[in-house]
Amino acid sequence: MRNSAVTPLPVPPPQGARETDGQARTPKAQSRQEPFGVYVHWPFCRAKCPYCDFNSHVRHGGVDEARFLAAYLRELDHFASLAPQRSVASIFFGGGTPSLMGAGTVSAIIDSIANHWTLERDAEITLEANPTSVEAERFAGYRAVGVNRLSLGVQALDDASLKALGRQHSALEALAALALAKRHFDRVSFDLIYAREGQTAKAWAEELRNALGFAADHLSLYQLTIEEGTPFAARHDAGMLHIPNGDLARALYLLTQELCEPAGLPAYEVSNHARPGSESRHNLLYWRGQDYAGIGPGAHSRITSGGAKRALSAIKSPEGWRAEVEARGHGLDSDETLSAEEAADEYLLMGLRLSEGLDLARLAAIDGRGLDETRLSALESQGLVTREGGRLAATPSGRLVLNRLILELAA
């Protein structure tokens, strides 16, 4: 979530095919099958955060929201033909800064999804938002058109850290936005970034305890990483930015687990914590290797077709993507069928991030061979992985060396 100058469309009047009270939207007749997700990428921001390498863009001259909406709806038509008769369990508006979209735009996209597929009665519909006062004023509109989960990009709880991270809001605005979000939405998540420059274990413990006291049902807690091509990377390479690494980074991660679990928000994924039952259903689709359609500039998709997994991605430039959609009906610039080995490696990579781990039988079914028993037994004996009930999971010690585990198991 990360900010822009957009003229929003008005909120439309209620429509007969739309319900926002938990009822199923008018669907096409379809068979029930594995959950399917739709990710919608809104790429525009008010400002680019110096640590961010996401596909986000600043347009000081404003954005033609109506024209972009027409492109989103047209690309949805295309994906409906690629993945027909699916049951949509989640919709996720990400970015960029989706809270710069008008509620009318969000509503039209949800309606289009409901018209193309079955939108499940209890579908999770998440929108990422920044906590600025202007964007917080839109929360009621988003709830009215069907959004039922809000994810706030808080990132830090003190003004000095927010300024260092290039954020556009203050700590007071963040707390006010969080309180407002909890009034409008039953499910609220917010993000924090830790392992920031100069941050000590004591300071992070105090900040995290404060965050846990706000009683959101989901927290995403990310260690700051230096991403190539960002202003932070340039400063880091020049010796002007120093972030915790090694033993301190490890200590901060362990401290995070020690504080969150007793507070009722255990880690269900490396960086994500939730009260049981409040996990992000959309992100679980990714980590469980299930299918999803990615709509918008730079969005990625995974769609099973003919028993094989297709990996699709779109043009990153917003205007370039829109031009292609207007000309061809979609903005895709890559459509690759993964080999059995590639699909298995991806399932391994994603599944080991989860506390629940991955299904070993499913992994073996993907590539026909499964994992090397000798390597697996060695990692078990080192206390890095566990096998139980046909599932493989990284232990807390294993999650500290997750990249090593994946490399060894995928070899």
Name these PLM-found stretches.
Residues 1-37, 46, 382:
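Flexible, acidic/Gly-rich N-terminal and inter-domain linker regions that tether
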Residues 391-395:
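Minor-groove-contacting beta-hairpin "wing" of winged helix-turn-helix DNA-binding domains
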Residues 43-56:
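Local cysteine-cluster metal-coordination motifs and their immediate loop/turn environment
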Residues 397-411:
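Short, amphipathic alpha-helical interaction segments positioned at domain boundaries
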Residues 367-381:
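Short amphipathic alpha-helical interaction segments
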Residues 380-390:
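A short, conserved structural fragment
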Residues 28-37, 55-82, 86-369:
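C-terminal scaffold of the Radical SAM
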Residues 40:
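Conserved N-terminal Rossmann-fold NAD(P)-binding element of oxidoreductases
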